[in-house]
Amino acid sequence: MSNTEYSDEVLEVASEAGHILLENGAEISRVEDTMERISSHYGVNSGHFFVLSNGIFTTSSASKYANVEFIPLRGIQLSKVVAVNRLSFDIAAGKHDLAEAHKKLNEIRDAPAKPAWEQILGSAAGACGFCAVFGGGFMDCAAALVVGMFLYIYCLTFSSRYLSKIVGGISNALVATLLCLAAYRMGFGTSLSNIIIGAIMPLIPGVPFVNGVRDLADSDYIAGITRLTDAMLGFFCIALGVGTSFMLDGWLFDGIINLSGVIVNPETAGLGWQSLAAFIGTAAFAILFGVPIAQ
């Protein structure tokens, strides 16, 4: 293999690592650092990497190599981010040659997502936990748990497969709120506001929002604005879905339910219950977003 071919192969591996990181929710600075770490270890210092929120541009000043990849905004799979990050440090420590690194990256990229039942469990437990955190009582939490479960069943079986991102976001919030309204009208729960807050928590685009802020703080203004726009669009879709569901409910029952605001139920207001609820909600969302258990 000539020096030029070797250099191009190294840049291909670095680009592959960046691709996996970016499409699974890593921030821009992590993507750039990882790509530079890999190429530097293999002796290629002529690579230049320009990373946006949905694209990677790779060029070399020592050859004619150039690569542009479009990477659409997708779901969050933090286990793959952790795996690539760990692999890059192993590469820097000299534990893998180029062929092994390429093979490892392919294994990470082809790794299956979390099983559907784990995602459904994470959504249900997260909705239940955060309903309690925001003041819901035991019946409110039970209603949020059931709604969170059916919400993610709907997300996995229908909206993520057949609907666009915007329409899917609106329909997810619509379905969640309609289920909350149905549960409340049947007598499950005492605070509709708390049930809805807990139920829609799995839909909140928290990772894109935080990454957008971090990118702006790192002076990556294009990527930061793009991700913040994506997150704000998600918030808008949730609000539109919730509002539409109240309009439908009011049309069916000749009147919109008056929300009393967030009510702190004394059943779960104690420090012990709040700590337990926060732990359950955080652990559930860690499962939902694919955070690995072993570090």
What do the predicted segments below correspond to?
Residues 1-100, 109:
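Soluble N-terminal domains of membrane-associated systems
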Residues 6, 23, 27, 72, ...:
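Catalytic cores of large soluble enzymes that bind and process phosphate-bearing ligands
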Residues 12, 29, 33, 82, ...:
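A generic alpha-helix surface/boundary motif
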Residues 74-145:
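Hydrophobic alpha-helical hairpins/lids featuring a short glycine-rich hinge
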Residues 74-79, 115-120, 167-168, 234, ...:
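Helical membrane-embedded segments and adjacent short helical loop/helix-boundary regions
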Residues 113-208, 285-293:
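Core alpha-helical transmembrane segments of integral membrane proteins
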Residues 185-295:
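Generic detector of multi-pass transmembrane helix bundles and their immediately adjacent loops
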